């Protein structure tokens, strides 16, 4: 089925196709180009709980990720300043590769990432929390103030005491006024029954009113001294004589009839 004139080239044959020659030269140039590039090693970050505090007295600069012709090699750009701490501490990984990013130090001029070192690129203040950034410290402050107010409640400078609203013009609170009113209530009721009510002035207990005069009482006592019971005609005569009604002519010994 195969013709004898067709033969496959041997593996040891020096003849190669032009396509294979071009492909091999391109791959060789690519390998040569790769060998000229220096790949930066990937950073291995340590967990925050293994970091150590470092004192800082100058501005901390962020790394410059791009090199521009007008910038010097290794110097951070002026816009890269993050904050300016004074006498504070920063947390950063411990190790010989850590370098503080101060423009005045010569170690900060070693390379692009010299401001943050080869181990880390993030610094945090020595605040209340070692895991969260320093911006979350204000929430811890607010929480601490709330706990203090719960333990020792007080009145803020701009706040008005609610008890002052309930005070009367005399300076007594509503509770004190309610206590005094409850004590004085029975006495006022007794005075009201006895005197029939009085104005805004303080009431004094008065004696019961007597509807008879002294002369009328003497005449009635004289009449009832000899006769305990009198008839209707004699009652009418005494009423006209003493200028009383028939119902008012009673025995003076019965005090309830004289005092109403």
From Swiss-Prot:
GO terms for cellular component: nucleus. Residues 1-21, 151-206 are annotated as: Disordered. Residues 1-14 have a biased composition (Low complexity). SUPFAM superfamilies: Homeodomain-like. It holds the Pfam family Homeodomain. Keywords: Developmental protein, DNA-binding, Homeobox, Nucleus, Transcription, Transcription regulation. Its main location: nucleus. Residues 205-260 bind DNA. Residues 167-179 have a biased composition (Basic and acidic residues). Belongs to the Abd-B homeobox family. This is Homeobox protein Hox-D11b. The lineage of its organism: Eukaryota, Metazoa, Chordata, Craniata, Vertebrata.
């Amino acid at each position: 089925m195969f013709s004898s004139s067709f033969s496959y080239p041997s593996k040891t044959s020096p003849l190669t196709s032009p396509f294979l020659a071009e492909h091999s030269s391109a791959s060789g140039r690519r390998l040569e180009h790769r060998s000229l590039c220096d790949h930066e090693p990937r950073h291995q970050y340590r967990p925050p709980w293994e970091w150590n505090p470092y004192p800082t007295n100058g501005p901390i600069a962020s790394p410059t990720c791009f090199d521009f012709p007008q910038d010097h090699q290794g110097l951070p750009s002026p816009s890269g300043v993050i904050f300016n701490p004074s006498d504070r501490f920063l947390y950063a990984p411990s190790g010989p590769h850590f370098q503080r990013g101060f423009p005045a130090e010569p170690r900060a001029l070693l390379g692009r990432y010299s401001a943050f070192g080869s181990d880390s690129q993030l610094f945090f203040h020595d605040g209340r929390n070692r895991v969260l950034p320093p911006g979350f410290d204000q929430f811890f402050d607010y929480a601490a103030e709330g706990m203090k107010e719960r333990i020792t409640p007080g009145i803020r400078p701009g706040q008005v005491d609610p008890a002052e609203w309930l005070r009367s013009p005399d300076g007594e609170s509503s509770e004190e006024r309610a206590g005094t009113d409850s004590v004085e209530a029975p006495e006022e009721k007794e005075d009201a029954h006895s005197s029939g009510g009085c104005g805004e002035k303080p009431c004094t207990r008065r004696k019961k009113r007597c509807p008879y005069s002294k002369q009328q009482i003497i005449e009635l006592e004289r009449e009832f001294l000899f006769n305990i019971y009198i008839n209707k005609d004699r009652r009418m005569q005494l009423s006209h004589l003493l200028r009383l009604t028939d119902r008012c002519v009673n025995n003076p010994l019965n005090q309830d009839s004289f005092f109403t």
